[in-house]
């Protein structure tokens, strides 16, 4: 081992190894697919508590509500949603 070496394999050697690609050939698409399903099924909205795209506005509204009082904004929106 050379002086100053940490004993780790060089990055180029890792990404050119067959073992790296055998492992990542399965894991990388799996992570992408899991993320796609997490978002497309709506589970992401439930997990993070964000409103779904169709819940931002009520059917009778055509634009975003305007909050007039800075510190009472939440109560204004709560009244609007009732």
Swiss-Prot record:
This is Cytochrome b559 subunit alpha. Coiled coil: none annotated. Keywords: Electron transport, Heme, Iron, Membrane, Metal-binding, Photosynthesis, Photosystem II, Thylakoid, Transmembrane, Transmembrane helix, Transport. Its cofactor is heme b. It comes from the Bacteria. It is found in: Cellular thylakoid membrane. Belongs to the PsbE/PsbF family. It is a single-pass membrane protein. It comes from Parasynechococcus marenigrum (strain WH8102).
